Design a protein with these regions (language model features):
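Short, acidic, metal-binding catalytic loop of nucleotide-sugar glycosyltransferases
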Residues: 1-8
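Structural recognition of the beta-strand scaffold that forms the well-ordered cores
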Residues: 12-13, 102-105, 119-121
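Catalytic phosphate/metal-binding cores of nucleic-acid and nucleotide-processing enzymes, i.e., regions
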Residues: 12-15, 37-39, 95-99
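Active-site-proximal specificity loops/subdomain of glycosyltransferases
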Residues: 16-74, 83
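Conserved glycosyltransferase catalytic-site signature
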Residues: 60-64, 89, 157-162
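Conserved donor-nucleotide/metal-binding helix-loop-beta segment in metal-dependent transferases, i.e.
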Residues: 83-116
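Catalytic core and acceptor-binding pocket of nucleotide-sugar-dependent glycosyltransferases
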Residues: 108-115, 122-188
């Protein structure tokens, strides 16, 4: 990731491991100790969020927590196993240059939702209409935490994207740069 985006970016990994799982805890520790651009976050101890213990929240929604962090100004949401392409880097650079609050990428015919859970970004240091983007995100989280889908079963498919569509997209749509190879004219 840093080869394409640069050393200033930090990868944040949210995890839920028992302290008794020494092998995996050791692997996480080794990963963090050998990579100074990785921030490990135990979802049972999340300071600065409306939920200190996020174990009941659908795991794919954990990756949205940086939107509540006052130390985060720019945030990209990707799956851990995603490969970053030069095309994506160019799209992100275009979005960052725009000053817009949200970035959404859809690059496959099956990407038929406004915001893919693992292909979007947020600028928290900008305005989103008449409010700051941070304020918009706090409001979104207030409604996200009241939505039963936020607490979906771990094996569920798509609750993260539905949450973004319901609670973020209504305000983000007009504040977004969208890169869409297939569906833009039809859906959004």
């Amino acid at each position: 990731m840093t080869e394409l985006y640069g050393e200033d970016w930090v990868m944040r990994l949210y995890y839920d491991l028992e302290p008794s799982d020494q092998q995996l805890m050791g692997q996480l520790c080794d990963l963090a100790c050998t990579n100074n651009n990785i921030d490990l976050c135990n979802i049972r101890q999340l300071p600065g969020t409306p939920v200190r213990d996020a174990t009941e929240i659908f795991a794919m929604n954990w990756r949205f927590f940086p939107t509540l962090d006052p130390q985060v100004d720019i945030y990209l949401c990707r799956d851990l196993d995603s490969r970053v392409s030069e095309r994506e880097v160019a799209a992100v650079e275009e979005w960052l240059g725009s000053g817009r609050a949200v970035h959404s990428m859809r690059d496959h015919p099956a990407h038929n939702t406004p915001v893919l859970g693992a292909a979007w970004g947020a600028r928290l240091d900008t305005e989103a209409g008449a409010q700051s983007a941070r304020s918009r995100w706090r409001q979104s989280w207030a409604s996200i935490l009241r939505d039963n889908l936020t607490y979906a079963e771990r094996g569920s498919k798509g609750p993260d994207q539905t949450i973004l569509t319901r609670h973020v997209w209504p305000w983000a749509r007009s504040e977004a740069v969208q890169h869409d190879s297939y569906t833009y004219a039809k859906l959004y």
